Amino acid sequence: MNNNLQGDAIAAAIDVLNEERVIAYPTEAVFGVGCDPDSETAVMRLLELKQRPVDKGLILIAANYEQLKPYIDDTMLTDAQRETIFSRWPGPVTFVFPAPATTPRWLTGRFDSLAVRVTDHPLVVALCQAYGKPLVSTSANLSGLPPCRTVDEVRAQFGAAFPVVLGETGGRLNPSEIRDALTGELFRQG
């Protein structure tokens, strides 16, 4: 397999995801690493790679809101809250939603909620559409190192054989803003 995922990049990335492996890809601000949210094996590989404890919880990134619905509980949202969220999506704003009991703990960590985002990065939209579901998404960097902004930086941190979807980031300087879906409270400035 070509580990740089050249040629039919989306199909090659999906093959890697279906093998319960982790891929790197450009997002709005930095490269992300991601995997199948329904595979505990894949998520544990991602957490080990990042040296991140499972109790911190993760973010899902999706092509559209429908892809996120199996993982979140939006029944408590008012029409005004929905309008606020949908006015920011697609885009670089992550919202923390209540999570139903069916959402795996390997995604939510110690929380009863899950952070989710509908991306506006064309390559990630195409990847999630082709895969048919969201991806776990976290910044592509090893513990203690800055997030990768280029393919070369990904290769330097993760190795030349690490599967990377080639492309450019969206040019944003900061990672996504994170807000509570119910209260609007700002958790991280974007």
Curated annotation (Swiss-Prot):
Pfam families hit by this protein: Sua5_yciO_yrdC
Domain YrdC-like: 7-190
BP-aspect Gene Ontology terms: regulation of translational fidelity; tRNA threonylcarbamoyladenosine modification
EC class (word): transferase
EC assignment: 2.7.7.87
Keywords: ATP-binding, Cytoplasm, Nucleotide-binding, Nucleotidyltransferase, Transferase, tRNA processing
Gene Ontology molecular functions: ATP binding; double-stranded RNA binding; L-threonylcarbamoyladenylate synthase; tRNA binding
Reaction(s) catalysed (UniProt annotation): L-threonine + hydrogencarbonate + ATP = L-threonylcarbamoyladenylate + diphosphate + H2O
GO (cellular component) term, any one: cytoplasm
Predominant cellular place of this UniProt entry's protein: cytoplasm
Compartments in which it is found: Cytoplasm
Family: Belongs to the SUA5 family. TsaC subfamily.
PANTHER family given in the database record: SUA5, THREONYLCARBAMOYL-AMP SYNTHASE
Role, per record: Required for the formation of a threonylcarbamoyl group on adenosine at position 37 (t(6)A37) in tRNAs that read codons beginning with adenine. Catalyzes the conversion of L-threonine, HCO(3)(-)/CO(2) and ATP to give threonylcarbamoyl-AMP (TC-AMP) as the acyladenylate intermediate, with the release of diphosphate.
Protein name: Threonylcarbamoyl-AMP synthase
